[in-house]
Regions:
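N-terminal intrinsically disordered, cationic/polar leader segments
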Residues: 2-53, 127, 142-147
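Generic detection of long, well-ordered alpha-helical segments
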Residues: 19, 23, 69, 105-108
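Conserved beta-strand segments of the P-loop GTPase G domain that flank and frequently precede/overlap
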Residues: 42-44, 93-96, 132-134
Length: 148
């Protein structure tokens, strides 16, 4: 089975959707997600500064509505709605998370909690919401792994 086949099989399994650490190249994930018709968002957290930095990057990338309140509750609300991005599913690829987590551990951990809750909410509705967390080789974020 090729990597693409494995990714297509994985992305089609809504019950497994959630937040994962992955070393799979973002281009491979993107290609598989496009094949199954998902919205794809690559978000670089490398020089994001704390809570405001991650909130702003996610909001901008996912084109959150103007009413987004720029706090964790508002992030949770928008991620569990996504009506303006209706589709078969969503894939977020968060890159350079090792840098962000090292400099802003509390904000990283809270963001992962919010993303996991959003994924669980979408799983209940049978819509896949995937988050692939990426960082430098050797970094261990304590998340379930999907590796090449």
């Amino acid at each position: 089975m090729t990597l693409m086949d494995s990714l297509l099989q994985l992305l089609s399994d809504v019950e497994r959707s959630g937040v994962y650490y992955s070393d799979i190249d973002a281009a491979e994930i993107t290609a598989a997600a496009k094949t199954v018709g998902f919205h794809i968002f690559k978000i670089d957290l490398g020089n994001a500064r704390g809570k405001d930095g991650i909130l702003d990057r996610v909001a901008k990338s996912l084109r959150f509505p103007d009413y987004f309140g720029r706090n964790w509750d508002a992030l949770a609300d928008c991620l569990s709605d996504l009506a303006w991005l209706d589709g078969a599913g969503w894939v977020l690829i968060l890159v350079h998370c090792d840098v962000f987590a090292r400099n802003h551990e509390d904000s990283f951990n809270t963001a992962v909690e919010v993303l996991n809750a959003a994924a669980a909410s979408w799983r209940e509705r049978k819509k896949p919401f995937w988050v692939f967390v990426q960082g430098k080789a050797g970094w261990e974020p304590g998340l379930p792994k999907i590796v090449a």
